[in-house]
């Protein structure tokens, strides 16, 4: 094969690889959607679409030139508009390839901050990552900047993309706070329990992992310069995630008694992230070790975030991308071997560098650690500033009601991403209020006395007493009021209740929404139906407590229905009447 033909073939493969990396956006969307709740699916899909589209706009305007423009002091590329002024001679292939890499960095953050982030805020910080944070540090590594000059090696982005995205995800999730119900606290505010909030569709999540794995062959292999090097990259890109998944399966099987499906899916991605930096310079043994460590590291990372840092990461983005991005970056300094095809790691003087375990000493390891520290520091400082500014201006987090109802209807006017298949995901988990939830003041407490008098008094003069002395009270209210209602009933002494999550609307037919510009008919809204049976506790007190708890003064506060109960029989003991309720009320 002549050099010219080889150049053409690999030029075409380079663009095919870019297309595969773009296809990874679909994989990220599926993983995030599957690992979160159905009521936020549309929001997840919209964010994964818009981070690429917004990223394209800002990458055209500034990001690409900062990354690959003429080097300025090893720190930054010279800003320019060659795509507009010199299109005929523009490096189109490099632009597309680096654009899809840039979009990957931004989309990693989405998963860790899912289900409680304002959409407008996501658009802003996603744009900043694509315009400034990623291009500048990527210039250090790939654009002729200072890290590339000293011999730092990150072939496809364990550091430049995954670690940066993972660090941004950690900082964002920490500032944002956990989802409602993720952590249970005692009266002193101390976290006593970590609650699982399962995703709604593991099938979609698994599909996303397979899409990402396929795309990773382009992610890691697109820049290969020979068939031999491409083949070696494909081998390491296959071995590492496979070993990571097997190790994770064994670990979770031993620890929990059964192999954990979602953790194994995360482990596959962790192995891919870890091998990305050194996929071109490691051999099969190195890939086995790198992948095996990644499989354990992702398990540790998920536990560490939940039980030590108390940071809520719904999809495991921090454990997968940050921790294994760091590991993959360091692993180059341990496992790089010059037996790999096309090996080209050298210091600023042109001296070849190899990994510690292959006789190269600590020099390459030191360079890799240096790169990790500086890129991590750059990312932490810049993204923290971005998130704090957004929090102080636009606000990062949606309201309590928006979070509980779901971001699909509240942020996008989409009643459900699964219209025609399911009414809505209104999770059955009890959602405890935490310090990151803005509850505001009680609407009843702040209402005028006239409104209180009109809304709350219970008139029972015309209601005949129940022959059995037992009443059934059915309360239908907004889902967002359930936690307060449950606590109010408990304080009153009513501990036995049946709770059903339902969809419905009153005469007002819910809030009108539009789909593709057309008006939707009556919108069914998520409601909660609470049924309690009371005997010794006066029914008037139950009604009054419920009304005070549910009152806002607006349409949709709910309804209370009271029924006579002829008889109650406890199946276990055969007790009847009031006695059958003694361990319920």
Where are these regions (language model features)?
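Positively charged, small/polar-rich N-terminal and surface patches that mediate targeting and assembly
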Residues: 410-417, 429-585
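Glycine- and aromatic-enriched membrane alpha-helices
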Residues: 1-461
